[in-house]
Amino acid sequence: MKLLIIEDEHDLNNALSKHLKKNGYGVDSCYNGMEALEYMQVTVYDAIILDIMMPIMDGYEFLTRIRSSNDQTPVLLLTARDSLQDKVSGLDSGADDYLVKPFEFEELLARIRVMTRRAYGQVSNEIRVDNLILDLAKKKVVRSGSEINLTSKEYEILEYLMKNKDHILTRQQIQDHVWDFDYEGASNLIDVLIKNIRKKIDLENSKPLIYTKRGLGYVIRNTEENQTDESDKND
């Protein structure tokens, strides 16, 4: 899951980034709304953590800008303002939730999970594709009752595929979603990680779930939907 932090307090920004990455999130961070708009031109985020009082462009103006362009990325306002009117103003500006500083990090994690569940139309922390289950809260993957151990990047890629079930994701989309804004790595890294994920989730006597669409990217589907055509492969 890819998050964008927009917070002008450098210490808090760094602490949030560190803790969120430790909990398995991909994170980009910036310090004002104008900079954030530039990030959003090249990366799609699952959720945004947004301060209100910032230089150059504050949180309210940033919210107005993205909502007027019909961007519905979930936004959590993170601010020291705790009056009822401040909360109402923030929510009316287009925020999905509001958390007052200081706060417990566990509450922030829970609110992020709730926001993203709503955005993806989920009613629980579990995502299912056939008999493969991914628990967003526990960062746990199970297939046919057997727990599967994934690296952090393998988990992030699988989560992204499962949240976009039946939709083809390009290698560039996967890279932008899982790695930091300025990442530059091996050109075949996505292919290598997908191959590793397949080896781990395709248990003995189980049918494959992740397919390659030649020239396009990858897609995850229920086994009964995997009537492959000449453009599909699982290698």
Model region roles, listed by residue range:
Residues M1-A119, D235:
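N-terminal/domain-start alpha-helical segments
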Residues K2, R113-I168, Q172, N222-T223, ...:
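Short, Lys/Arg-enriched segments at the junction into DNA-binding effector domains
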Residues E35, G215-V219:
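Glycine-rich nucleotide-binding loop
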Residues K140-L209, R214-L216:
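Positively charged, aromatic-enriched patches within helix-turn-helix-type DNA-binding elements
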